[in-house]
């Protein structure tokens, strides 16, 4: 395994650990999710380019489309929660509260 793969895997792991540790704020969770998606995109692109997989060349672009949709929905949810409650805590997303 080359150093590039190790660094990208380390970036994914750090983003995942950040998602587990800083899950109280919605903005921190969204940033960690974006870091995970970016590292997956780079890893997938490098793997496809090195192995010359021409049939799978659209897969990273599809992943980017899903990442953009996830970012747009996450930011709209962040704006809605912050205008309604005044904070961006994830605990405000619980719909079963009175």
UniProtKB/Swiss-Prot annotation:
Membrane topology: Multi-pass membrane protein
Entries under Gene3D superfamilies matching the protein: 1.10.287.3510
Membrane-spanning ranges: 1-21, 30-50, 61-81
Keyword Glycoprotein: no
Subcellular location: Mitochondrion inner membrane
EC number: 7.1.1.2
Top enzyme category: translocase
Keyword presence, Nucleotide-binding: no
Record-stated family: Belongs to the complex I subunit 4L family.
Record protein name field: NADH-ubiquinone oxidoreductase chain 4L
Species for this entry: Neovison vison (American mink)
């Amino acid at each position: 395994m080359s150093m590039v793969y190790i660094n990208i895997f380390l970036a994914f792991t750090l983003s995942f650990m950040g998602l587990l540790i800083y899950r109280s704020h919605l903005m921190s969770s969204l940033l960690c999710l974006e870091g995970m998606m970016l590292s997956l995109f780079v890893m997938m692109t490098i793997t496809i380019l090195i192995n010359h997989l021409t049939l799978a060349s659209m897969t990273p672009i599809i992943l980017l489309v899903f990442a953009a949709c996830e970012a747009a929905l996450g930011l709209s949810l962040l704006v809605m929660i912050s205008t309604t409650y005044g904070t961006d805590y994830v605990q405000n997303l619980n719909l079963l509260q009175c």
